């Protein structure tokens, strides 16, 4: 897929501009972030979740606001670079990586019989 690069000066909203993006590679190309295909292949879900996390931490970004339009590019680059410099196990983007031990639930016989 050929991706049109992101332009903060576009008349489209961010949602409209990103409507056709379907992969992590599309997002990185859209935001002009150079990437190593191997890193993206192994970490695509982690990169996209981290990007989402960074946008969430940035607060309520009005997609028509010029500042918001400039804030999304560094978030995409930072999300990708997190996994160039580290790995999924270290970054712990998803809850399953943050769990130290298996979750155990004890149900007594009395609870079962009541």
From Swiss-Prot:
<dbReference type="Pfam" id="PF03206">
    <property type="entry name" value="NifW"/>
</dbReference>
<dbReference type="InterPro" id="IPR004893">
    <property type="entry name" value="NifW"/>
</dbReference>
<protein>
    <recommendedName>
        <fullName>Nitrogenase-stabilizing/protective protein NifW</fullName>
    </recommendedName>
</protein>
<comment type="similarity">
    <text>Belongs to the NifW family.</text>
</comment>
<comment type="subunit">
    <text>Homotrimer; associates with NifD.</text>
</comment>
<comment type="function">
    <text>May protect the nitrogenase Fe-Mo protein from oxidative damage.</text>
</comment>
<dbReference type="GO" id="GO:0009399">
    <property type="term" value="P:nitrogen fixation"/>
</dbReference>
<keyword id="KW-0535">Nitrogen fixation</keyword>
């Amino acid at each position: 897929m050929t991706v049109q690069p992101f332009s903060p000066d576009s008349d489209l909203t961010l949602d409209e501009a990103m409507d056709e993006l379907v992969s992590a590679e599309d997002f990185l190309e859209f935001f002009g972030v150079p990437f190593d295909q191997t890193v993206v292949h192994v970490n695509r879900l982690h990169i996209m979740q981290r990007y989402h996390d960074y946008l969430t931490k940035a607060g309520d970004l009005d997609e028509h606001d010029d500042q918001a339009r400039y804030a999304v590019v560094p978030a995409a680059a930072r999300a990708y670079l997190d996994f160039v410099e580290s790995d999924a196990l270290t970054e712990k983007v998803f809850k399953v990586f943050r769990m130290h031990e298996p979750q155990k639930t004890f149900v007594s016989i009395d609870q079962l019989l009541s």
